[in-house]
Amino acid sequence: MAQLKVTLIHSAAHRLPKQRKIVEALGLKRVNSSVLQPDNEATRGALFQIAHLIKVEEVK
């Protein structure tokens, strides 16, 4: 299964509470922090909600 490397490129400060919770749930803490997440529907849905804050790369 492929994984997604998610990098926070914009701060979650001054964003909607739902968006801040998604950033925290994904394990992103600071700007330029990255995490590996599984490539599934739930993860893709969360990433879609905060697409304007992150950069996503596919890792094999």
UniProtKB/Swiss-Prot annotation:
GO terms for biological process: translation. Signal peptide: none annotated. One of its GO terms (cellular component) is cytosolic large ribosomal subunit. It comes from the Bacteria. One of its GO terms (molecular function) is structural constituent of ribosome. It holds the Pfam family Ribosomal_L30. The keyword Kinase does not apply. CDD domains: Ribosomal_L30 (cd01658). Keywords: Ribonucleoprotein, Ribosomal protein. InterPro entries: Ribo_uL30_ferredoxin-like_sf, Ribosomal_uL30_bac-type, Ribosomal_uL30_ferredoxin-like. Belongs to the universal ribosomal protein uL30 family. Part of the 50S ribosomal subunit. PANTHER family: LARGE RIBOSOMAL SUBUNIT PROTEIN UL30M, MITOCHONDRIAL RIBOSOMAL PROTEIN L30. This is Large ribosomal subunit protein uL30. It comes from Levilactobacillus brevis (strain ATCC 367 / BCRC 12310 / CIP 105137 / JCM 1170 / LMG 11437 / NCIMB 947 / NCTC 947). The lineage of its organism: Bacteria, Bacillati, Bacillota, Bacilli, Lactobacillales.
